[in-house]
């Protein structure tokens, strides 16, 4: 009798879980179909607005990794970095509250379902993705800073720093290019998490 009761509970539990999984999969497929149908119709102004939120993970990546490795690159882009990007980066670093304010502004104004303004799906997607990239960059930066200073200035430490910087830069560049094209980027894990997050939202 006890075994039968236990089996019945497990069966009901599996049925409920399966139903929830199917509902989630249906929403995900429906969202992807909707996304594919609207990609080619996105206006240029919306595409450009979709790239703006990526300044947040970019500056976070420059703060955590870029400022340590970029000055050693003997390329023509370094003067451009020092004259244009570095002053903005210093301003960002000196006003730590700016990143936090931008983070909450992106979420409450552009990502949230009850946004005070109508938001295009492409803008919402890229805003959410920039938030996740910002969080990933912040986490990597915190972990890297947790290591002893001897490791961080060593050859291996600079290699790790270099790798993290190029990971952040490449994902942001890829996302911006896709946004300008009016398409949705597909970064493993991160883009999937974004699609799941906005799957219940209306455009």
Swiss-Prot record:
Q: Classify the protein's membrane topology as the record does.
A: Multi-pass membrane protein
Residues annotated as transmembrane:
2-22, 51-71, 84-104, 131-151, 153-173
Keywords carried by this UniProt record: Chloroplast, Membrane, Plastid, Transmembrane, Transmembrane helix
State the Pfam families in the record.
TIC20
Name this protein carries in UniProt? Tic20 family protein Ycf60
Cellular component per GO?
chloroplast membrane
Which PANTHER family does the annotation name? PROTEIN TIC 20-II, CHLOROPLASTIC
**Main location (coarse class):** plastid
The compartments listed are: Plastid, Chloroplast membrane
Q: Which InterPro entries match?
A: Tic20
Q: Which family does it belong to?
A: Belongs to the Tic20 family.
Organism expressing this protein natively: Pyropia yezoensis
């Amino acid at each position: 009798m006890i075994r039968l009761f236990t089996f019945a509970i497990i069966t009901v539990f599996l049925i409920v879980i399966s139903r929830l999984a199917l509902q989630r999969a249906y929403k995900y497929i429906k969202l992807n179909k909707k996304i594919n149908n609207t990609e080619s119709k996105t206006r240029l102004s919306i595409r450009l607005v979709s790239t703006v939120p990526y300044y947040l993970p970019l500056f976070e990546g420059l703060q955590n990794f870029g400022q340590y490795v970029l000055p050693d690159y003997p390329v023509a882009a370094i003067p451009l970095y020092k004259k244009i990007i570095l002053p903005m980066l210093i301003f960002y670093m000196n006003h730590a509250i700016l990143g936090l304010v931008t983070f909450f502004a992106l979420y409450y104004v552009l990502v949230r379902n009850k946004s005070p303004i109508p938001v295009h799906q492409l803008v919402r997607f890229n805003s959410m993705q920039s938030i996740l990239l910002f969080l990933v960059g912040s986490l990597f930066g915190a972990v890297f800073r947790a290591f002893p200073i001897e490791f961080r200035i060593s050859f291996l430490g600079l290699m790790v720093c270099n790798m993290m910087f190029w990971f952040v830069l490449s994902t942001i560049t890829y996302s911006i290019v896709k946004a300008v094209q009016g398409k949705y980027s597909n970064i493993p894990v991160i883009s999937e998490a974004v699609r799941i997050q906005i799957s219940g939202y209306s455009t």
